[in-house]
Regions:
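C-terminal binding/interaction regions
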Residues: 4-17, 84-145
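Short hydrophobic/aromatic-enriched beta-strand-loop microsegments
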Residues: 25-27, 76-83
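A short beta-strand-loop structural module common to alpha/beta enzyme folds
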Residues: 24-39
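Glycine-rich phosphate-binding loop
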Residues: 45-73
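Non-catalytic beta/alpha edge segments that cap or flank active sites
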Residues: 17-22, 29-30, 84
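Structural motif
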Residues: 2-3, 55-59, 76-79, 96-100
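A general structural signal for well-ordered alpha-helical segments in protein cores
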Residues: 15, 39, 43, 66-67, ...
C-alpha cells in the first residue's frame, strides 16, 4: 500500500524525519521549507490520492487544519492523533485512511510510535463496526455531490 505524505511549514521538519523512517512513502510536498505556504494545498494533494483509492495518507501541520481539509474529500476519513492508542483505534474502529499529526505538539519519537501503531492496526470487520462504516458511507453519499 502506498503512503502519501504532505506537510506545511509547521510540519515540514517532522515530515522530513518521517521520510527517513518510511523510505517508500511518496512526498507530495512541500519539498522545501516555506514559511508562507498554506496547509490546505498539501492536505488536498494527499487527500486526492487517498480519495481515489491510491493509498493511505499522512499529513503534518501545526495543530490540525490538514485533517479538516482532508475530510472535505469523498472516501477520506482523516483523524488527528497525538498518541499511538488513538491512532490504533482510529484505524480499527473508524477505518481512518489519513493520519494527521500535529507537529506543534508531537515530538519525532512519538510521531514514529503513532505511525507504527496506525500502520500495524487492522480495520475491524465485525458487524457493529461495518454497520457504522456503512452509515458513514450513506451520509457521505447524501452530502457529497
Amino acid at each position: 500500500m502506498k503512503i502519501f505524505l504532505g506537510a506545511d511549514h509547521r510540519g515540514f521538519k517532522l515530515k522530513e524525519k518521517i521520510k527517513e523512517w518510511l523510505k517508500a512513502a511518496v512526498d507530495l510536498g512541500n519539498d522545501q521549507f516555506d514559511p508562507d505556504d498554506d496547509f490546505p494545498d498539501y492536505a488536498a494533494l494527499v487527500a486526492q490520492k487517498v480519495s481515489r483509492g491510491e493509498g493511505l495518507g499522512i499529513v503534518i501541520c501545526g495543530s490540525g487544519g490538514m485533517a479538516l481539509v482532508a475530510n472535505k474529500f469523498k472516501n477520506v476519513r482523516a483523524v488527528e492523533c497525538w498518541h499511538e492508542l488513538a491512532a490504533k483505534h482510529a484505524k480499527e474502529h473508524d477505518a481512518c485512511n489519513v493520519l494527521m499529526i500535529p507537529a506543534d505538539f508531537v515530538i519525532p519519537l512519538q510521531a514514529k510510535k503513532i505511525i507504527k501503531a496506525w500502520l500495524e492496526a487492522k480495520i475491524l470487520v465485525d458487524e457493529k463496526h461495518q454497520r457504522r462504516l456503512n452509515k458513514l458511507k450513506q451520509i457521505e453519499e447524501r452530502n457529497f455531490i
